């Protein structure tokens, strides 16, 4: 989650330090990153006050936008609620701030595939949902007069295959004597 865990300067801070107005919404490893409007990818647990997670690690100029939409963070009836929040925040930043560079991570499909595997029943639903969210962002750019000022990169962070069997590597390492307990180990997989 934490930007200060990175060993090199991230693209958000690099661009910000070069004088660009930079926004980032739910982009990985941005908690505490230096940018103009940063709302990090850091998720509160069920029942946890989202302010304790977001406020200390968002940029000061993004907090008002976060507060407008934080009520969407716990709509557990919608499996894609993090992307609803991210899109609402993104639309406001685009319309009100008009950043030079914008990073946005929509995670609906990735989250489903991590939980259910590559061949999921809800894949079409997730793709339709993401298509709608991208449409909302493009509409905001068009309304703000910035649509033709941006170049878009749509990325996936990894491929994925279905898992047929699991392998407990820490069990093997423990059996080999490399792990005694969680505090006494020579090798441990995470």
Indicate residue ranges for each PLM-predicted region.
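Catalytic-core regions built around general acid/base machinery
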Residues: 11-14, 126-129, 133-145
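N-terminal start-of-chain detector that recognizes signal peptides
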Residues: 73-77, 125-127, 167-171
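Glycine-rich loops and low-complexity Gly/Arg-rich segments
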Residues: 47-51, 127-130, 177-180
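Secreted, luminal/periplasmic, and some membrane-associated catalytic domains
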Residues: 1, 121, 136-190
């Amino acid at each position: 989650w934490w930007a200060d865990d990175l060993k090199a300067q991230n693209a958000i801070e690099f661009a910000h330090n070069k004088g660009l107005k930079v926004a980032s919404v739910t982009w990985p490893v941005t908690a505490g990153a230096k940018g103009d409007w940063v709302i990090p990818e850091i998720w509160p647990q069920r029942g946890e006050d989202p302010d304790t997670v977001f406020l200390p690690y968002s940029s000061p100029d993004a907090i008002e936008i976060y507060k407008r939409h934080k009520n969407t963070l716990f709509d557990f009836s919608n499996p894609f609620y993090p992307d609803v929040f991210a899109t609402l925040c993104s639309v406001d930043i685009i319309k009100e701030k008009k950043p030079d560079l914008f990073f946005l991570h929509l995670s609906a499909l990735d989250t489903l595939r991590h939980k259910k595997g590559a061949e999921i029943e809800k894949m079409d639903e997730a793709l339709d949902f993401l298509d709608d969210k991208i449409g909302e962002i493009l509409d905001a750019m068009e309304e703000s007069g910035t649509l033709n000022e941006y170049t878009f990169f749509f990325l996936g962070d990894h491929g994925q295959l279905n898992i047929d069997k699991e392998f407990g590597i820490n069990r093997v390492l423990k059996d080999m004597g490399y792990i005694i307990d969680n505090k006494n180990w020579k090798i441990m997989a995470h």
